[in-house]
């Protein structure tokens, strides 16, 4: 039995989808433990691009897929993704936790209206209803997938919630109320499609562990968007750390292989402090070469140099023992590359990320500068064949964080991957 966990070390969009995809080739179960359709992961197989927002990345390898209790589910999006699998003749088993919460139309409405009302102070959410859905969960008024299996229970909870939500929509936001019958009838159609997938996933995972099955746990977003440890309030609404995987029913002590995904540069979607942000044309070049646009929102991502403070924080919080570096190929033909090693503010050197966003906004990055490499590295298969400049960049990261980068991605396709030890190439 082997249980792997994969998490992002930055602000999401690190390239987790590709890494998870090939790790899933010999995995029995892939489990998503957090977030909703605000996360997007892109996988390229045989020159065909797949983008999923809810289904785990391992779905293309035939692993059984579980959406855990802490995932919030938009039924329409999930149905659309299931249709993609069907249309591409991809056969797999999908299990939805009966404890997972359901995104309702009023959650999406609240998300949109709240962002509008905040104006220049908006968080920059995806407006998918994720935050309002988690808020209802915390307030203990959310609708769970188990409620969908009993029409009377679902209808009563919807009625109670909608009466309260419509009061807020009308009186606080001066907008039109939502219609109860429209929502009920629409969701009844969703229920017919999804009800056979809703089950006790905790029981399935316990059986899998006892049967010594191989399990891969997949996190959405990244460490710096964690609700507790990220750049609050410019964060997501869920816990993104490996510790949150316990919510799936898998004891943390069982997870031996913890893999952190690092993008060779930094990116961020939406508002919030971004110390290493590149404000000149180099940022634009990296964005275009790397196609750095949100999988979910299509918004252009903000681009920055690699920030080692975020990587060190992610390693410490997640107890990572393996690293994968992605999109190294995007950095070719750039004269100088930079890595941030510390921050400075008012004469004080920070080797950690301050808690206050107001402080983070004011710090100055301290950089180590590297000579760039010109070669196209996207077809290189062996580490020693990489340009010396690329290897110096990689080895500096390893020296600073104390963990070997075992996997290098030099292109979006599965085969454009360099393994630095036999353990990963044989999985």
UniProtKB/Swiss-Prot annotation:
Sequence positions that bind GTP: 12-18, 40-42, 301, 327-329, 409-411
Keywords assigned: Cytoplasm, GTP-binding, Ligase, Magnesium, Metal-binding, Nucleotide-binding, Purine biosynthesis
Catalyzed reactions per annotation: IMP + L-aspartate + GTP = N(6)-(1,2-dicarboxyethyl)-AMP + GDP + phosphate + 2 H(+)
Needed cofactors: Mg(2+)
Keyword Protein transport (UniProt): no
Enzyme Commission number(s) of this protein: 6.3.4.4
GO cellular component, one term: cytoplasm
Extent of the signal sequence: none
Residues the record marks as active site: 13 (proton acceptor), 41 (proton donor)
Cofactor, how bound (note): Binds 1 Mg(2+) ion per subunit.
Binding site for substrate: 295-301
UniProt binding sites for Mg(2+): 13, 40
Annotated GO MF terms: adenylosuccinate synthase activity; GTP binding; magnesium ion binding
The protein's name: Adenylosuccinate synthetase
Organism of origin: Borrelia duttonii (strain Ly)
Lineage start: Bacteria, Pseudomonadati, Spirochaetota, Spirochaetia, Spirochaetales
This protein's encoding gene: purA
